């Protein structure tokens, strides 16, 4: 039977490992916002960042994130979530100008990446919001062109 100190050591290792994995996963979007991981930037301010989803449902599918690491959107305080929605509205306005559509749909899921984020999706119909649909496969040049169009519109606002 292992000694108490060995069990504590193993527990500490598990906790450390779990924290490292959780922190690493949480940091992916933060690293994108900081420019440590490349992205297709669509808009930004001091608090929030918007970039194209690399597995888009439709062309222009954009993610908005807080720069601050927060897992669950409803863990944000009222003022911060209000500012986040105002930022998302600005990105949606730019998105609609860049990619004319009936409406820009908004979805908050957050099960795959533990960092609060809003999906903004240019919609021609409700089926464009079905996350079970096959994802588009766009070339890097197409992604960059789409991001540039959205960011150009964003800067006008």
Labelled PLM ranges:
Residues 22-157:
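HIT superfamily nucleotide-processing domains
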